Structure formats: structure tokens, C-alpha cells
Design a protein with these regions (language model features):
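Active-site-proximal, substrate-binding regions of enzyme catalytic domains
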Residues: 1-87, 94-107
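Cys/His-rich short segments
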Residues: 111
């Protein structure tokens, strides 16, 4: 399962063939910028909330790594959702990649 952040979705013309999901905040960010690809991807992209327990783990790891101030709340939910679904994060955000690496969450760079 791929867990996509906003940067991954903004950079794609089509979704990966692998099953993909994202937190609701990512959808809100794309909607804010009137990205019409959501109209095409709506049925293919699973939208899921993360658990509070996973958010706590991400917050603690981000504090330890020094990335807490660089991660948006949506970034943190991407990482937490990856924990919940045992997924691989797809992003170009260095802070997300750094916290994912520290936490042992698989991560792939966009592009």
C-alpha cells in the first residue's frame, strides 16, 4: 500500500498501479488548489484517517529528529497513516523522508 502526500499527487499524471491511500488533509490540500485530477482518481484513491496512537508515535519521533517544526499537521498524518496500514510513503518532502527513515517506515521519493 502506498501512502501519498500532496507533493506526490501534485506531481503525478496518473496514480501508481499499486493500491494507494492518503489522509483527508491531502485531499483538502488538492481541493484548495482546484486540482481536477481528483475527479478522475476519486474511486481509485482510498482516503483514511490515522489513529491517535500512530500520531503520538510520529510526534515523538519528529521531536527527537528535530523535524517537528518543519512538518505540517497533514505531513504528520501521512506518516501516521503509513504506520496504520503498514504502507510505503511516497513524497518529495525531506522532513517526511527523514522521520520515516528514523521510524523504519518505508519511503520512496517522487520522481
Amino acid at each position: 500500500m502506498l501512502v501519498l502526500d500532496s507533493s506526490a499527487l501534485f506531481s503525478m499524471e496518473q496514480l501508481p498501479e499499486e493500491e494507494s491511500c492518503c489522509p483527508p488533509g491531502v485531499i483538502r490540500e488538492l481541493t484548495k488548489y482546484k486540482d481536477h485530477r481528483l475527479d478522475l482518481w476519486g474511486d481509485l484513491l482510498r482516503v483514511s484517517d490515522c489513529t491517535g496512537e500512530s500520531m503520538d508515535k510520529v510526534t515523538e519521533a519528529a521531536k527527537k529528529s528535530g523535524d517537528l517544526g518543519r512538518l505540517s499537521p497533514v505531513d504528520m498524518t501521512v506518516l501516521a497513516l503509513a504506520i496504520d496500514v503498514n504502507g510505503t510513503v511516497l513524497t518529495d518532502d525531506y522532513s517526511i523522508q527523514n522521520v520515516a527513515r528514523i521510524m523504519g517506515i518505508p519511503c520512496r521519493a517522487v520522481g
